[in-house]
């Protein structure tokens, strides 16, 4: 059977190398709760996950997914923008932050992430990451603002101080139709 190479699965491989039981993690774009669930399973009973989304439907979907897997108590699921994540976690305390830019699968495509708030949230998240912590970014393009957001985020990542952050950007090189771009930032 041929293995699927989804962007989120690729990112999860890196996340699993960086998250330990007892860690604090953030899912900056909770969506349907897939990344939140992965993070909750990795932090164990002694860790915690804070998941953000601006859509009530995403909050309910995430809570339901976590409850179905018996890990809801490990997460704080917050109806708020990821630009406010510093109000919920201390600087230099977070092991991993995940972002999936774009719109909620199955949701309103008009409610999508935007370049300005996404870049602001990335910088907020970098302050929260502890040394050795990582940020996973799944950058989708297309839609009304996707190309603008993709280009702005990639430009911003390129400008991060190389003495403080290692930025790895990959791409599905031979796939048509603007496939998503996985990126990782490790705080040095």
Which stretches of residues belong to each language-model region?
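S-adenosyl-L-methionine
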Residues: 1-24, 37, 41, 59-92
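Helix-to-beta-strand junctions that scaffold the AdoMet/dcAdoMet cofactor pocket
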Residues: 20, 43-44, 129-131
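Conserved beta-strand signature within the Rossmann-like core of class I S-adenosyl-L-methionine
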Residues: 29, 121, 128-139
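Conserved SAM-binding loop of SAM-dependent methyltransferases across substrates and taxa
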Residues: 32-46
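Conserved SAM-binding motif I beta-strand of class I
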Residues: 48-53
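Mobile active-site "lid"/loop adjacent to the S-adenosyl-L-methionine
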Residues: 99-121
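Class I S-adenosyl-L-methionine
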Residues: 148-188
């Amino acid at each position: 059977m041929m293995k699927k190479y989804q962007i989120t699965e690729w990112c999860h491989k890196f996340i699993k190398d960086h998250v330990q039981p007892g860690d604090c993690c953030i899912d900056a774009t909770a969506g349907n709760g897939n990344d939140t669930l992965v993070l909750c399973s990795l932090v164990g009973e002694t860790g915690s996950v804070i998941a953000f989304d601006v859509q009530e439907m995403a909050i309910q979907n995430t809570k339901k997914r976590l409850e179905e897997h018996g890990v809801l108590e490990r997460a704080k699921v917050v109806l708020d923008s990821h630009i406010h994540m510093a109000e919920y976690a201390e600087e230099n305390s977070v092991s991993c932050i995940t972002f999936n830019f774009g719109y909620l699968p199955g949701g309103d495509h008009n409610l999508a992430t935007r370049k300005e708030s996404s870049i602001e949230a990335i910088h907020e998240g970098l302050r929260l990451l502890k040394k050795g912590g990582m940020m996973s970014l799944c950058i989708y393009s297309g839609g009304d603002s996707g190309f603008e957001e993709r280009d702005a985020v990639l430009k911003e990542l390129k400008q991060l101080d190389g003495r403080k952050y290692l930025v790895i950007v990959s791409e599905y090189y031979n796939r048509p139709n603007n496939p998503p771009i996985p990126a990782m930032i490790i705080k040095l």
